[in-house]
Regions:
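Short, well-ordered amphipathic alpha-helical segments that serve as non-catalytic structural scaffolds
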Residues: 17-18, 45-65
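N-terminal basic/disordered segments at the start of proteins
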Residues: 6-29
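Conserved small/polar residues in nucleotide/adenosyl-binding loops
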Residues: 135-137
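Short, charged, solvent-exposed linker or helix-capping segments at domain edges/interfaces
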Residues: 126-132
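Short, conserved loop-to-beta-strand elements that form functional interface hotspots
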Residues: 8, 12, 73-121
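A structural signal for the main folded, soluble domain(s) of proteins
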Residues: 10-12, 35-38, 48-54, 121
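Short, low-complexity cationic-aromatic patches
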Residues: 25-29, 61-72, 107-112
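Right-handed parallel beta-helix/beta-solenoid
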Residues: 28-45
């Protein structure tokens, strides 16, 4: 593993959520991070799992020193039943700061109803907003 790449796994027990993240760059250059949020399959209904994922997302972004200050470029939600889950997700997303969002109907392999992949960077780039500004289903 390169000295410019770091992989971590963090468990948030009270949310029954695991976050895996890889950090790239540093030392004066642009930093990038890929975060993957998983919720335990038995963590309740879709709405409860969505709430747990969003709380974990905010907790990690505000508390992890190496991620703090980074800007989300895009979020990709993996849903088990996008047609029936989209409305609840859309209601949550309208209340939060925007970044490009995509939704994929691909059930998470662990059997949960939702998973989230987030790409962050330390230096926002206007090109990202231009190319990644639409919500895709």
């Amino acid at each position: 593993m390169s000295k410019n790449m770091e992989y971590r796994k963090h468990r948030i027990e009270y949310l029954r959520t695991t976050v895996e993240y890889s950090l790239f760059g540093g030392e004066g250059g642009t930093r990038e991070a890929h975060l993957m949020f998983h919720v335990d399959p038995e963590a309740g209904s879709y709405e409860e799992q969505l709430t747990a994922i969003r709380k974990a997302y905010h907790r990690i972004l505000s508390r992890k020193v190496k991620i703090r200050g980074m800007v989300p470029v895009f979020c990709r939600y993996f849903l088990s039943d996008a047609a029936n889950q989209w409305e609840a997700l859309q209601a949550v997303l309208q209340k939060e700061p925007s970044c490009a969002v995509s939704v994929v109907q691909q059930p998470p392999l662990d059997g949960s109803k939702i998973a989230l992949w987030v790409y962050l960077t330390s230096e926002p780039n206007a090109a990202y907003k231009h190319y990644l500004s639409l919500i895709h289903i």
